[in-house]
Structures are given as structure tokens and as C-alpha cells.
Amino acid sequence: KQYSMKKSIIIMVLMAFTNIAIAKTLVTLQQLQGKWQCTEDIYKVNTETWTFKKASFIVENKYVYRDKVDTSKYEIFYYLSKGVPNVYDGSKVGKIGSGTHIIYYAKRRKKILSYEIVSLKGDTLTLSQFAPRAIGRNAGIVTITLKRVSR
């Protein structure tokens, strides 16, 4: 009886992982384009806006640090892919019409990174990314939910 219980638990865990792995959404460049705002309020006065263009997306942050409002803005060149490639191909930037992953190259870290497109329902875009261990955070999957502000 105990053996079958362990077996059942293992099967349920495997099924859950399989469902998570399959939960990718195919989107087009046109569907992504526009301005999106992060719905998670990580800091009390944090505003994170993502603006997708055909070949790049711009992330703008407004936050409070030591009682002072600060901002940051950076542009990331990307392409869509139906999986995470082993090698970054800059010639695909802005040219692939659809995909399940947003692929970009992190120059400082000298490595290819990606966001998995978990879902796009109406004006809500959900992305996930594996985040490495950092100060105050263990390694793991981070989910980002964005609401469309404008097209």
C-alpha cells in the first residue's frame, strides 16, 4: 500500500512538471508590440513599463531608493523563437514573426537569456524566466505579469 502511494505521488509530480513545460503560448510580433505595465508592486512606488517594438523592447523603472525617486531605462534587442537556442543569432532580431520565447543577449554576462511566454490573454501578458541566485534571492523561476497600456 505504501509503495503505491509513493508511486502515485511521483506520477502526480511528473504530470505537474509536464503541464508546466507545455504551458507555452505562441505569440506574434504584432501581438507583443505596444506599451505594457508590470502588475506586481514590488516596491511601494515602483512603476515598471515595457515597450515592445519590432526589434527591441525598452524597460523603464521608476522607484524610490533612500527616500529619493530614481529612474532607469534600458533597451534590449530580441527575437522570437519556438524554443531556447544554444547560440544567439542577432540576424533574427525583428525578423521572426512568432514564437514561444523572447530571446536576447545579455552583453555584460555574455550569455543568451530568454523569457518564456506563458500566456497572452486579452491585455494580460505573462512571462517567466529562470533567475540565477542573487543577493537576497535563491535561484528559481520568476513570473512577470504585464497589462497592456497602449498599442
Located regions from the model:
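Positively charged n-region of N-terminal signal peptides that target proteins for export
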Residues: 1-8
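Generic beta-strand structural signal
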Residues: 31, 51-54, 80, 96, ...
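Residue-level recognition of conserved beta-strand positions in structured domain cores
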Residues: 61-62, 129
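N-terminal helix-cap/turn-to-beta initiation motif at the start of protein domains
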Residues: 22-37, 150
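Edge beta-strand at a domain terminus
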Residues: 24, 71-86, 124-151
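Contiguous, well-ordered beta-strand patches that form the walls/edges
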Residues: 41-45, 62-122
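Sec-dependent N-terminal signal peptides
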Residues: 8-17
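N-terminal targeting signals for Sec/Tat export/insertion, comprising classic cleavable signal peptides
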Residues: 34-58
